[in-house]
């Protein structure tokens, strides 16, 4: 891990910031990284969304499409929360750049953080290929983005 600095989803380090008010603690992250090797963020909270909040999914595209205003992040009540997701993505990018983060470890399947697979917008549990809004923005700016599972495969 030498020479790498990580931006990590706050929920993965035990912060109760998920939409349901819970965390997704991955103890191995805490065990394998020193506090001076990472900075944490929850893009959704940084974008102004509360804890807890209604579940949200990207409809008609993926995170890149949301950044291009060609798709929307809609919560389960039908509210368009795209602006908060975009604001949070830019907050994550700003934090990553300020700390010169080279890598991001972000929560799988999240409409903000996921890389590779996201929920399809139907709120039925179906997944499609695509990145979350924050993951897409970080990738656009040259960061290496991985899920917690990909990080664990790398270290175990």
Question: Which role fits each region the language model picked out?
Answer:
Residues 1, 19, 27, 46, ...:
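Divalent-metal-activated hydrolytic enzyme cores
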Residues 14, 48-49, 111-114, 153:
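Short, active-site-adjacent cap segments at secondary-structure transitions
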């Amino acid at each position: 891990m030498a020479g790498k600095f990580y931006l990590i989803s706050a929920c993965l380090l035990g912060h109760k910031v998920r939409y349901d008010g819970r965390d997704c603690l991955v103890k191995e992250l805490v065990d394998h990284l020193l506090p001076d090797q990472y900075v944490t963020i929850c893009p959704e909270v940084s974008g102004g969304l509360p804890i807890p909040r209604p579940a949200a999914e990207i409809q008609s595209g993926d995170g890149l499409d949301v950044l291009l205003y060609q798709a929307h992040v809609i919560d389960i009540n039908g509210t368009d929360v795209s602006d908060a997701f975009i604001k949070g993505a830019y907050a994550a990018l700003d934090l990553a750049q300020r700390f010169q983060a080279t890598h991001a470890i972000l929560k799988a399947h999240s409409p903000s953080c996921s890389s590779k697979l996201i929920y399809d917008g139907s709120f039925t549990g179906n997944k499609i290929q695509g990145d979350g809004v924050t993951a897409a923005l970080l990738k656009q700016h040259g960061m290496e983005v991985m899920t917690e599972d990909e990080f664990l495969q790398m270290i175990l």
